[in-house]
């Protein structure tokens, strides 16, 4: 499969993808990376999560960025010692292109007392005839955090031209409810508000996904955060000014079909709708957690 040619074909067949060829190319590489990991058995101990999971497992309309997994609190990164070589060999042979895979420092990942995140960076030269162009890059992250839910699902075809062989790949992934909880934890704990978290929360809400305050509390504990709900409250207060800044619209145009853009961020009132949705859901979480903790314990 020629990734560059297939990405161009997909975008040519769908005018609404105009200008998104690089992002489509990255999504095709996601399939390739997951296929290689499945082939060599690396996925068995991992659980897929995050926005790319929403896209590749549940059919989200937001294009994806990175591959995020959790392996559990006691995950042993040594079982991934050959991941770099396998990815390099499979991608190089399949595409006859130059590939570079960097892996984490395994010695630094051996501390079981703290949460560890192993990061692999896969770069592929998709246009070798144009040396001035940057290589396509995919980030793969695996964290020593527990998945509290797990369902086995096949990959979905995000584009009709995606090879049928990919949909035979089965992955363990979090439920929509847990991904929603993750999104609120991320909203609270990231250094800054991320546009994709806001979009994903509203997308999940439109699918009637309920967020469990107790699961959010447990996840804050998983990350050793004792003031998670306070941080979430602060972020909800910051949200209106962030959304009014224009940063949200600018970022999301990289990940949305033109038809989705026209029906969402270009519509009057859409930003207000997002703010209202996320704040309402967040306030429900805050009320639920406070009602379970009496002011005076007896």
Give short role names for the model-derived ranges.
Residues 1-46, 57-60, 72-298:
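Structured mid-to-C-terminal alpha-helical surface segments
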Residues 49-52:
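Glycine-rich beta-strand-to-loop/alpha-helix junction loops that act as flexible
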Residues 64:
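Anion-coordinating catalytic cores for phosphoryl-, nucleotidyl-, and glycosidic chemistry
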Residues 69:
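Structural signature of FAD isoalloxazine-binding scaffolds in flavoprotein oxidoreductases
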């Amino acid at each position: 499969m020629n990734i560059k040619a297939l990405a161009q074909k997909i975008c040519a067949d769908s005018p609404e993808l105009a200008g998104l060829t690089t992002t489509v190319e990255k999504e095709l590489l996601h399939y390739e990376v997951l296929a290689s990991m499945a082939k060599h058995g690396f996925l068995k101990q991992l659980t897929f999560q995050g926005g790319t999971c929403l896209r590749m497992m549940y059919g989200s309309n937001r294009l994806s960025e990175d591959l995020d997994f959790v392996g559990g609190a006691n995950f042993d990164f040594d079982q991934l010692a050959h991941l770099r070589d396998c990815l390099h060999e499979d991608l190089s042979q399949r595409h006859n292109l130059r590939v570079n895979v960097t892996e984490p420092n395994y010695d630094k990942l051996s501390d079981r007392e703290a949460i560890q995140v192993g990061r692999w960076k896969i770069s592929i030269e998709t246009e070798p005839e144009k040396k001035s162009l940057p290589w396509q890059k995919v980030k793969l992250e695996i964290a020593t955090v527990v998945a509290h839910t797990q369902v086995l699902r096949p990959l979905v075809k995000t584009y009709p031209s995606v090879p049928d062989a990919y949909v035979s790949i089965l992955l363990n992934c979090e439920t929509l409810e847990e991904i929603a909880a993750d999104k609120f934890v991320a909203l609270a704990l990231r250094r800054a508000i991320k546009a994709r978290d806001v979009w994903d929360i509203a997308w999940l809400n439109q699918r009637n996904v309920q967020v469990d305050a107790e699961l959010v509390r447990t996840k804050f504990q998983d990350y050793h955060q004792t003031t998670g709900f306070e941080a979430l409250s602060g972020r909800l207060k910051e949200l209106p000014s962030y959304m009014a800044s224009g940063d949200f619209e600018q970022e999301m145009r990289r990940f949305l079909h033109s038809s989705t853009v026209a029906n969402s961020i270009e519509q009057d009132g859409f930003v207000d709708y997002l703010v209202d949705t996320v704040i309402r859901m967040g306030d429900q979480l805050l009320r639920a957690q406070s009602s379970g903790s009496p002011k005076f314990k007896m």
